């Protein structure tokens, strides 16, 4: 019997090549957005990346695009309150949502960002999938549950990407995956497959590229 939320398998050669070609194109930072009025034209499909601060979001985007330093990490949780848009060739926007984990952010800033996030998620017709990044060392935390609930209510399909998988021994990883699967079973918008990655080692990057390349 197959587990609910199985790990994504490595794509076949043709699917992997489609992903490679998409991400072989030029990757560039387009703009940071602080209000809906600043969004770029909805003229191509887009995927967004959400995750708590220090989950490895910038590293993952840099690994996907093969462009070191394209997405820059902030060491202060909640500091960057912009939605950052990157172009991936002429076909795709990669959208970096601000890291959540608000211990050091003023309440007014948090509320403003949450409003913008809700508006973006519910109002962006070209958004094909959200990727929610979960640190393999820690599993799903309360703040992750909050973003998943928001994606449920916004009717945006989201897929969990486990980061830093190389930092966890295989026996411990199985326990964490059980916890993640249990959490995902409560979310109707969760895509029924998990991607295991390590930006440092390159594990799972080709798989994620292929998944993105086959969204339409």
Curated annotation (Swiss-Prot):
The keyword GTP-binding applies. The keyword Secreted does not apply. NCBIfam families: GTPase_YsxC, small_GTP. GTP binds at residues 51-58, 78-82, 96-99, 163-166, 197-199. GO terms for cellular component: cytosol. The lineage of its organism: Bacteria, Pseudomonadati, Pseudomonadota, Alphaproteobacteria, Rhodobacterales. Belongs to the TRAFAC class TrmE-Era-EngA-EngB-Septin-like GTPase superfamily. EngB GTPase family. CDD domains: YihA_EngB. GO terms for biological process: division septum assembly. Necessary for normal cell division and for the maintenance of normal septation. Keywords: Cell cycle, Cell division, GTP-binding, Magnesium, Metal-binding, Nucleotide-binding, Septation. Residues 43-216 form the EngB-type G domain. Mg(2+) binds at residues 58, 80. Pfam families: MMR_HSR1. This is Probable GTP-binding protein EngB. GO terms for molecular function: GTP binding; metal ion binding. InterPro entries: G_ENGB_dom, GTP-bd, GTP-bd_ribosome_bio_YsxC, P-loop_NTPase, Small_GTP-bd. It comes from the Bacteria. Its cofactor is Mg(2+). Gene3D superfamilies: P-loop containing nucleotide triphosphate hydrolases.
């Amino acid at each position: 019997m197959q587990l609910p939320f199985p790990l994504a398998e490595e794509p076949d050669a043709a699917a992997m090549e489609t992903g490679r070609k998409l991400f072989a194109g030029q990757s560039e930072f387009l703009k940071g957005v602080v209000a809906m009025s600043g969004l770029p034209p909805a003229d191509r499909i887009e995927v967004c990346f959400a995750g708590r601060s220090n989950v490895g979001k910038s590293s993952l985007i840099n690994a996907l695009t093969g462009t070191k330093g394209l997405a820059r990490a902030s060491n202060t949780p909640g500091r960057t309150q912009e939605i950052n848009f990157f172009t991936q060739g002429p076909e795709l926007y990669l959208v970096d949502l601000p890291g959540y984990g608000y211990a050091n952010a003023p309440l007014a800033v948090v509320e403003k960002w949450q409003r913008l996030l809700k508006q973006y998620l519910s109002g962006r017709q070209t958004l094909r999938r959200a990727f929610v990044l979960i640190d393999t060392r820690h599993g799903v935390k309360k703040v992750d549950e909050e973003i998943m609930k928001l994606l449920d209510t916004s009717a945006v399909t989201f897929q969990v990407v486990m980061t830093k998988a190389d930092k966890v021994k295989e026996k411990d990883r199985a326990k964490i995956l059980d916890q993640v699967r249990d959490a995902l079973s409560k979310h109707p918008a969760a895509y029924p497959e998990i991607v295991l990655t390590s930006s440092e080692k390159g594990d799972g990057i080709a798989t994620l590229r292929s998944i993105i390349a086959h969204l339409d």
